[in-house]
């Protein structure tokens, strides 16, 4: 992926390392790029490589998202990237100790709100009308997309000769 000149962004899988013997724990096998999943939580996090030109184009890191600068830069660079590559190998090992966010993500709660703002601003830049709410799952976000107008919803319930089952489905 790094040899492909068309790739703007590369990210890899990761795990955490624990203790003096550097034991590998909590492997994080990430999916290929999925913007809807990324808007719900920062699944990319570490070992994220971006072309220098792209970092310059988006204006680099922003203090506006203190604690979630990585999430913001990932959102802004993937907005502009033409080709995003996922290397499905664990190439990043995150050291975990008692005081690190690797061991206790909730130790920096302000990061969660900063991430929410980063997603909200991303959606605004993309022209998507939505509200971003903090999820009950720390580090996750719920996106409530606006539904313009009053769209009709059709439901197809295949029930053939079981018409009484239809009543159960619609009441």
Language model segments and positions:
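Conserved donor NDP-sugar-binding/catalytic core segment of glycosyltransferases
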Residues: 1-25, 53, 88, 95-97
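Donor nucleotide-sugar recognition loop
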Residues: 59-75, 110
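Short, well-formed alpha-helical segments that are part of the catalytic scaffolds
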Residues: 162-171
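Cell-envelope/extracellular polymer assembly enzymes that use nucleotide-activated donors
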Residues: 72, 151-156
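A recurrent flexible, glycine/aromatic-enriched loop bordering the glycosyltransferase active site
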Residues: 23-53, 66
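Catalytic donor-sugar/metal-binding loop of nucleotide-sugar-dependent glycosyltransferases
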Residues: 63-65, 75-95, 99-101, 116-138, ...
């Amino acid at each position: 992926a790094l040899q492909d000149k068309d790739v703007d962004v590369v990210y890899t899988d990761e795990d955490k390392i624990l203790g003096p013997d550097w034991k590998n724990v909590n492997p994080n096998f990430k999916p290929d790029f999925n913007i809807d999943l990324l808007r719900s939580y920062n699944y990319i996090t570490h070992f994220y490589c971006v072309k220098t030109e792209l970092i310059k184009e988006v204006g680099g890191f922003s203090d506006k998202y203190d604690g979630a600068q990585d999430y913001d830069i990932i959102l802004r660079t993937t907005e502009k990237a033409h080709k995003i590559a996922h290397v499905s190998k664990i190439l990043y090992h995150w050291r975990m100790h008692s005081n690190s966010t690797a061991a206790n993500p909730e130790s920096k709660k302000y990061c969660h709100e900063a991430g929410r703002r980063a997603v909200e601003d991303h959606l605004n830049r993309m022209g998507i009308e939505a509200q971003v709410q903090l999820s009950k799952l720390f580090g996750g976000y719920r996106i409530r997309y606006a539904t313009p107008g009053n769209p009709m919803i059709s439901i197809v319930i295949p029930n053939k000769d079981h018409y009484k089952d239809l009543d159960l489905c619609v009441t």
